[in-house]
Each structure stands twice: as structure tokens, then as C-alpha cells.
């Protein structure tokens, strides 16, 4: 019987630097001999990418936004994540359900209980084996975004939105200390990757 793969997620506010490290993490796992599926949310499937485009660019109600996030996630789980884990592959995903609790729950102030209903309806048992939360002072995150591409609908939000989002992320980390590890991504890239590599090796050696 094929051993189940491992599910890794990367989280953080826009500008925290998580996407910078996602491809590196996947390559590090491949160097350890693991087969890796690198993916992202919202997205990861043709339908998911279409929904991503809508969510990031079109004006909509908060309920619609949240439901579209979970619609994309349901397709992603069914078509990509669950089959990969069943094959014994490792999945590295740029954002997952923690992002919904942070952005819609914290940033947009939707009640966490409403998000929990959708999470329980979908796949309550499937949680990441490890989540790295890339945390950075918001001034630095916004400075990084200023040098990036044309900002999307979320990246154009006011500072208070990101303060609430960051606070919600840190609350998630406090509530799930066994799964979520905080990474101070204001440090140099070499220091961040040294931490990630050490923790990744420990995870890879776990039975």
C-alpha cells in the first residue's frame, strides 16, 4: 500500500514573501527524493484559475467572494490535492483555508463561524501536515508590494485591512501551534531558507 504523501501550505499577507519561497521549497523536497506537486489557491485547476481571476479583479459581495474561494478549493481538493496525496506525492500549496480565515474572516470581518461551516461541509478531516506562516511588519510588506506588478483587488486594500488580516493569521498560529510555524520573513532570504530547510528535513524524517 502506498504511503500517504504530505501536505504543506504557505501563508502570509501579501508582500510577506511566501511565494518567493514556494518554488524553492518544492525544489528542496525534490532534492530529498520526494515527488512534489506545487500548486496555489485560489487556483490550481482550470476552473480554479478562472475563479481566481474573478475574485482578484471583480467587485462582489463578501458572501460571493467567500463562496467562490470554497468552490475553487473544492475543485482543487478533488482534482489535485487528494489524488496527489493518495499517490504518495508531497503537495506544496501557496495558501489554503487559513487564508480564508485571515482575509475574509479577519480582513473583511466575516464571522469565523460562517467560514467554519463551509470548511466542515467540504473536507474537515484534511488539514495540512505543516503550515509555514510568513510574518512581516506591514510597512515592509507594503513597501515590497509597491515594487511589484499592478496590484490586484486585495493588494489595493487599506492598511487597516492588512492589520486585521495579519492579526487573524497570528491568532490561527496560536490556535494551531502543532501545525503552523511562524517564519520571520523580514530576515534575509538565506536565514529564512535555513530555518525552512531544517524544519523541512525534520518533517521528511517523520514516520
UniProtKB/Swiss-Prot annotation:
Keywords: ATP-binding, Kinase, Nucleotide biosynthesis, Nucleotide-binding, Transferase. Coiled coil: none annotated. It comes from the Bacteria. GO terms for molecular function: ATP binding; dTMP kinase activity. ATP binds at residues 12-19. The keyword Lipoprotein does not apply. PANTHER family: THYMIDYLATE KINASE (PTHR10344), UMP-CMP KINASE 2, MITOCHONDRIAL (PTHR10344:SF4). Its EC number is 2.7.4.9. GO terms for cellular component: cytosol. It catalyses: dTMP + ATP = dTDP + ADP. It comes from Bordetella petrii (strain ATCC BAA-461 / DSM 12804 / CCUG 43448). Transmembrane segments: none annotated. The gene is tmk. HAMAP family: Thymidylate_kinase. Gene3D superfamilies: P-loop containing nucleotide triphosphate hydrolases. Belongs to the thymidylate kinase family. One of its GO terms (biological process) is dTTP biosynthetic process. Phosphorylation of dTMP to form dTDP in both de novo and salvage pathways of dTTP synthesis. CDD domains: TMPK. This is Thymidylate kinase. InterPro entries: P-loop_NTPase, Thymidylate_kin-like_dom, Thymidylate_kinase.
